[in-house]
């Protein structure tokens, strides 16, 4: 058993060496609070609001409205917005250089990518101006007017597909499409029927209207004479007779 026993014998090992008397400034006092003047009666015993109570106001806190939100809420926007709400502008009046810990914290640098914080009136360090409700309504009105003028609202951004092609490229593409249209689709119908598909635009000519096929003979090539044909037949019969004699001689 220890010679010196005390309930606080290990207190010095876990005690802080500095004064823990600092804290981040808060926007609202911590709850619960023991001051009597902090509470204000708003409703009567029957549950109805008292007549002197201000009924106009935002009871859900100061958050962004519908017209201040971006078109698409992404993860990057949420991180940026959270960093702004978590007190990035608390030390606006104190220009200072960021330490290594703050440089490594990319979430803290979401609102301002600079390494040195400026003065209070520095435009790079001031709060970003959000879109007002009137500006949002004006944009919506402009969009509705444009959609009323034309059937479909056209995008102002020119895409890469609408880039003008060279005339040579247009000709080659036209030839390719014509060749594709000339081919007839394989169907169970006869060839003489009317074209129903765009690639059957060239209707085949019926057999009655087709001109008679004439085989053109070259002028330089002489025609085979009947005498030459008969001589060729006789030579073949002679060769056959000689082959039979050879086989008979081998057999003996």
Swiss-Prot record:
One Pfam family it belongs to: CFAP126
Chain residue ranges for the region called Disordered: 177-252
Ranges of Basic and acidic residues composition bias in the record: 218-252
GO aspect biological process, one term: cilium organization
Listed GO CC annotations: ciliary basal body
Similarity-based family: Belongs to the Flattop family.
Name of protein: Protein Flattop homolog
Species per Swiss-Prot/TrEMBL record: Drosophila melanogaster
């Amino acid at each position: 058993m220890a010679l010196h026993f005390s309930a606080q014998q290990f207190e010095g090992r876990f005690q802080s060496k500095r004064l823990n008397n600092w804290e981040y400034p808060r926007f609202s006092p911590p709850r619960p609070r023991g001051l009597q003047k902090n509470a204000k009666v708003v409703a009567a015993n029957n549950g109805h609001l008292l007549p002197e109570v201000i009924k106009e106001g935002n009871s859900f806190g100061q958050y962004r409205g519908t017209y201040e939100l971006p078109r698409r809420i992404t993860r990057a926007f949420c991180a940026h917005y959270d960093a702004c709400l978590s007190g990035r502008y608390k030390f606006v009046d104190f220009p200072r250089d960021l330490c290594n810990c703050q440089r490594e914290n990319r979430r803290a640098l979401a609102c301002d990518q600079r390494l040195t914080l400026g003065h209070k009136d520095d435009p790079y360090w001031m709060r970003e101006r959000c879109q007002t409700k009137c500006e949002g309504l004006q944009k919506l009105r402009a969009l509705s007017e444009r959609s009323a003028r034309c059937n479909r609202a056209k995008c102002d951004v020119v895409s890469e597909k609408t880039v003008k092609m060279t005339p040579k490229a247009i000709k080659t593409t036209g030839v390719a499409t014509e060749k594709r249209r000339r081919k007839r689709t394989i169907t169970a119908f006869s060839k003489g029927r009317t074209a129903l598909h765009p690639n059957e635009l060239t209707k085949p000519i019926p057999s009655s209207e087709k001109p008679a096929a004439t085989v053109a003979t070259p002028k330089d090539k002489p025609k085979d004479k009947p005498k030459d044909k008969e001589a060729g037949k006789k030579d073949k019969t002679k060769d056959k007779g000689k082959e039979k004699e050879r086989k008979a001689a081998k057999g003996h």
